[in-house]
Amino acid sequence: MTESIDEIRIERAQGIGFIALNRPKALNALSTPMLHAIHRALNAWRDDASVHAVVIYSPHPRAFCAGGDIRFLYQSAKAGEHAVIEEFFTDEYRLNHAIFTFPKPYIALLNGVVMGGGMGISQGARHTGGVRVVTGSTKMAMPETRIGLFPDVGVSWFLARTPGAIGRYLAATGATIDAADALYAGLADAYMDDDALPALIDTLKEKPFATGAEVVRFIETQARSLGGTASELEKERGFIDKHFATGNGAACLKSLESVTGGEESDWAARTAAELRERSPLSVDVSLELIDRAKSSSMAETLRRDLGLTRATFDHGDVMEGIRARIVDKDNQPVWKVARMEDVTRDAVVRMYDNPWAERDHPLAALAD
């Protein structure tokens, strides 16, 4: 199968399916045609015995994928096209689940920006027996609380399985992490230098492979150690666990703002300032999301994400967040609840109300 649209190129070579993201001006932000093209390819390759593995990558150095097409979703909502928004997220989450349950190694090469929807089309690789490769340029994040959203695309399932309170910390703050952090947190599996990726892809297209496991082993032989590069998350782990292990956003803030003196004080002050810039409602929704994901399947996680997405557009902060951060860029969002301390438990629980009967949920058929 070979398919080309302006935003993506899909081809096969030497028993491997290749998906190249090609929307560089938008940092490969996912459009509906891109979602559909990737899903069609996976459906075609799933039961094709001549395809042993899948590699998804970006030929552009700045970004693997910066997320979903947020401007498109904002414009659709402003136009009252709510069905378009729901269709986009439903299609995206179906794709995330198809990757998570793909029966062959799925390999993601994660250079540059890897955020939001980019995490959704890459994190499932580990579950398939594949590998997530990060590089020196990797900038990984789920920054959704900055725009009044939450860490969707099933990523709460992965964040809930990171060491200690790292998942809650990343979900609430939207902090950007590098390759060393991603490896420490279990959000990546191997490291390669950026300038080694083009040669790796060329070799994968030329070298014959008999099995998917053979493809993975070959990639692992090309990976290298980060050597003495330390993970900031690892160094800050004690602080993170102390302040983010339990409680809502207000409790985390109170804990951070109670610190006085020393190295922890500087870190706590920076982190508290970051939290104060986020949507208070989204922070609490995101912390709750990680807690719930700990005991959920991926299918349950994605069904929950879809309900939350509708709630955030209906009565959450996402429209104001996108306006302030991305459209007008005044960086002065007026959140529905101004202070973290004023978010009520009822407001958080309301966001989790399921708008569908169980059998009518658009993702009812998903099963891990």
Spans of features found by a protein language model:
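Glycine- (often His-adjacent) and acidic-residue-rich active-site loop
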Residues: 58-94, 146-148, 351
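Substrate-recognition/cap regions that form aromatic- and gly/pro-loop-enriched pockets
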Residues: 253-262, 267-307, 311-317
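Glycine-rich beta-to-alpha active-site loop
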Residues: 99-147, 169-179, 190
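Amphipathic alpha-helical blocks and their helix-capping loop/short-beta junctions
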Residues: 193-275
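Contiguous mid-protein beta-loop-alpha structural module that forms a pocket-lining wall or clamp
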Residues: 154, 161-214
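Hydrophobic/aromatic residues within transmembrane alpha-helices
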Residues: 56, 69, 121-122, 181-182, ...
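C-terminal amphipathic alpha-helical interaction region
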Residues: 308, 316, 320-368
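Conserved CoA-thioester-binding segment of acyl-CoA-metabolizing enzymes
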Residues: 1-57, 97, 366-368
